[in-house]
């Protein structure tokens, strides 16, 4: 495996550390038959607003006429679109449901809001673009590429403060 020290994208405070995505995030793949979850809400990439982390209105698995296996996800997991990832379609699931197989349900040991904000960031997406640079067809990030991405990890209290601060600023912006 490559050495993190050779890849550090920017400086971080001494109390923080760098980690690879896979060491703090589990891609919680759990493909299920949609007919067994007909009344669950369904999230597809189209249900997530670009670059904001906002969930748009969703319909049930039955209403969306889902026929192929989808991932069962749980409230609090981050749903991340692996198709055209530079559109930055990611959201914290506000409920248990099913998501398209074109998405990854992510389970993390980090503060979920902190991870979401980092996944939506330019720093993360520059690494995504670099990881996918050899792809010529449909832009898509696979698990191996995603797992190698670096994440700056502040202490948990700072993660919470960062997430809270960003949410507060976004709330003020929304009022403008």
State each model region's role:
Residues 45, 143-146, 167:
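ATP/adenylate-binding site constellation spanning eukaryotic-like Ser/Thr protein kinases
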Residues 21-31, 54, 95-96, 104-153:
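Basic, amphipathic alpha-helical recognition segments used for DNA target recognition
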Residues 11, 20, 72, 78-82, ...:
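Structured core elements
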Residues 41-59, 78-99, 113-117, 126-136:
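Short, ligand-facing micro-motifs at secondary-structure edges
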Residues 17, 26, 48-50, 85-86, ...:
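Short, glycine-/Ser/Thr-/acidic-enriched flexible segments
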Residues 2-7, 22-33, 45-75, 93-95:
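Sequence-specific dsDNA recognition surfaces
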Residues 37-39, 73-75, 99, 145:
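Short, well-ordered loop/turn elements at secondary-structure boundaries
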Residues 2-32, 152, 156-176:
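Non-catalytic DNA-recognition/assembly elements of restriction-modification systems
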